[in-house]
């Protein structure tokens, strides 16, 4: 996704250097083989932590390119492909993708902040919301290894209130340390 947006943005920048025209990404998300025993025409897919990582990385990419990406639409939202909810009769389940969207909503309407990553295995983005709060979203891309993350924040860290929310599977896969 990053390569596609980067290449399209480069072409658009030639003809629209003021970035008046936005790029719209339509129907992004995972697309796997149909679940056995389901109607192939309905494209039902179970959702897992893998889908949460795809959503997190993709939303980070959109955040990095917020100067050009003005809208991005998940392919499906209910019971199909990378759904945010699954339903059966009167029952409803929020998927890992739902929880990623819930965590990432703090970036909407914000200003992208420059962020530097030293090392491998993590994908992240940062923004400042209209109230001046800084939000950092991090994805650990390792299937097996937990990752330790140390954040160096410019400014007065003692006067800042920190909060972390971690979406994970059976194992703790991300350890966060903050320093000024």
Task: Give the predicted meaning of each segment.
Residues 1:
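Phosphate/diphosphate-binding loops
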Residues 4-5:
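Membrane-embedded translocation segments of transport machinery
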Residues 8:
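Active-site-proximal structural segments of metal-dependent nucleotidyl cyclase/transferase enzymes
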Residues 14-18, 67, 156-157:
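Short helix-capping segments at alpha-helix termini
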Residues 20-133:
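Aromatic/acidic polysaccharide-binding cleft in carbohydrate-active enzymes
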Residues 85-90, 138-140, 147-154, 165, ...:
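Composition- and surface-driven signal marking solvent-exposed, interaction-prone regions
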Residues 121-158:
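Carbohydrate-binding surface patches
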Residues 157-180:
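Acidic, Ser/Thr/Pro-rich beta/coil linker or hinge segments at domain junctions
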């Amino acid at each position: 996704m990053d390569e596609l947006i980067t290449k399209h943005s480069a072409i658009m920048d030639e003809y629209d250097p003021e970035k008046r025209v936005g790029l719209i990404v339509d129907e992004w998300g995972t697309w796997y083989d149909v679940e056995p025993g389901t109607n192939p025409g309905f494209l039902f897919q179970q959702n897992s932590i893998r889908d949460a990582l795809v959503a997190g990385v993709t939303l980070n990419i959109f955040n990095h390119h917020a100067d050009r990406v003005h809208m991005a639409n998940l392919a499906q939202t209910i019971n199909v492909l990378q759904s945010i909810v699954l339903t059966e009769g009167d029952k409803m389940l929020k998927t890992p993708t739902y929880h990623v969207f819930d965590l990432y909503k703090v970036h909407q309407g914000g200003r992208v902040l420059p962020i530097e990553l030293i090392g491998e295995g993590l994908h992240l983005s940062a923004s400042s919301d209209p109230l001046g709060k800084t939000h950092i979203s991090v994805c650990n891309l390792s299937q097996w290894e937990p990752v330790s993350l140390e954040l160096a924040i410019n400014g007065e860290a003692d006067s800042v209130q920190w909060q972390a929310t971690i979406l994970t599977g059976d194992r703790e896969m991300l350890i966060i340390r903050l320093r000024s």
